[in-house]
Amino acid sequence: PQCDSLIARTVGSQQMLTCAAPGYLVQHGTPQSPDDLARHQCLHFLHGGRVSRWRFQQKGKETAFQGCGRFSADNGEALLELALSAFGIVQLPHYLVQTALDSGSLKSVLSDFQPKPVPVMAVYPSRKQLSPKVRALVDMMGEAWGKAV
């Protein structure tokens, strides 16, 4: 919904990564393209009760995928735990999965189709009513997110 009294400012971006546990991939195979996901258990994030679409870059353009799976949740950490337990393939922000990828607990899949980074937004009331503390927080978020990514 659009609200004229709110301002949205991009403070950073996050890369979404598609991954699965090695055990899941041994049992079900490794998808070679986003189309292959239709034959896999996908662990989807819920936004407002709706299953989110996964985004991919394919042949220079962005495509979306909304598959089916045994589980969906509105909690990234819960989806991460399900993926680590070999329940399916998940697409989550890099900051949630990077440690598991580094340790080998998860394997990246479809890296040739990696989507563009997703913007991280700070949403706040109109600048007319913006307190110095809120302005400082939003500025700090932009600086911190830029260093973290």
Regions found by a protein language model. Give the residues of each.
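Short, surface-exposed, low-complexity cationic segments
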Residues: S72-L82
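Alpha-helix/helix-capping structural signal
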Residues: P22-G23, E77, Y95-L96
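C-terminal effector-binding regulatory domain of bacterial HTH transcription factors
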Residues: H94-T99, S103, F113-V149
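Alpha-helical segments flanking ligand/cofactor-binding loops in enzyme cores
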Residues: R9, D35, L80-E81, R135
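A ligand-binding cleft/hinge motif common to bilobed small-molecule-binding domains
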Residues: L80-S105
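Ligand-binding "clamshell"
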Residues: Q2-A8, A100-L110
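Acidic, Gly/Pro-rich loop/turn segments at junctions of secondary structure
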Residues: P1-A73
